[in-house]
Amino acid sequence: INIHWDRVEKEKGEFDWAPYDTSLDALLRYDIVPFVSLTGGNGMYTGTGTYDDPKLAAIYGDSPLPPLDDKGKAGWLNYVTTAVNRYKDRIRHWEVWNEPNHRNYWGAPPDGHAYGELVRYTVEKILELHPDAKIIAGSMAGISADFTDKFLSRCDPEKIDVISFHNYGNRPENRVYAIEKFKKVLDSYKPGFEIWQGECGIASTSRTTGYRSTGPGGPAIQAKWLLRQSFVDTWFCHATLSNYFKLFDDGELEPELTARKPSGPDKWFGAPERNGSRMHAEGVNAKCLLSVPDRTPKPAYYAYQNLCAAMDDRYKRAEPAYRFRVANPGQFHGIGEYEDAFPSVPLLAAYESEDAAFLAYWLPWIPQEYVVDFAKVSLEVDVSFKEPLLMDLITGMVYSIDVVTPGSGKSVFAKLP
């Protein structure tokens, strides 16, 4: 939950917590553990600013500046103090700011050193009031090793428990390329830093507000993407938590038209935010797992439900040796153990508990809405199974499956879809 400073303090010294009280009470009623981001400037103390780029200024409008001067810092720490004192009996996990490396959410050109200073004095205040608190910092838009290095150089890493990131895009696997440098930076400050992926999702339709990918949207695409994201985060990115954004949205299906007048290529393609990704500030965020307005579950909702039913934190990341062979590529033309194929073969994420193993595999193509001709692959893996089952996490269907055990601790599965 993002607790925005300027939403709770609209008059100096006067706080309205009612919406957050309602949300937190509902979460706790269902034994859901919340983590809260204290975030956003407040124009009464900090002033406001916007992008230099007129297109982005038209999309985002003005945002409060970050609380970096004496006046802003004093107001911010009063807000932090009030929030922590109010909720410390209900909240243990506190995150410092939402996406400080994003111009709109930071409120000014991103500055890792400035964010690090804000983390330093915010964390000191939280721990003074709530010594048992768990501190989350980073909350970056994307995975930025450089930004991480800058902010950790200005605060005390020993007082931070978790570093978090948010990573969108039409292929969850793309985030893997940034993780190695990111982890090296973390280890240089504190080996063993816990990593969370705190926010990310994909729209079930090409019409959405908020960030959108450049790929097509669809209900099945969303479900497949959600599952792939979960395994990419917890296996390839070493995250101990992978969060999906979001459950529901209360935006308007037919928002008012903006006053923007596109020019140049934008006349044909719309107004791109960046990299061809269009942005509308109002409407429905179609990344939600419940349809708008009736809130019926989408396929991704059930996929997430199936995943959470199938595994939990008893399973730990494992690294068994394995090899896929493509027997029939189906509609996925060109896959196989070829040097010039990308992606070539499925990926594997492996987890083990005290008495079981969980293997997830998928082909890292851009997700397809419809698959009419599945590929067939074989898997050799250094994990032993007594009674293996094959589960389709999209549908929840479970199937018996044959396994060959050529030797102790090894399994071979043939003709997997």
Tell me the role of every PLM-derived stretch.
Residues 1-82, 95, 101, 412:
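N-terminal substrate-binding region of glycoside hydrolase catalytic domains
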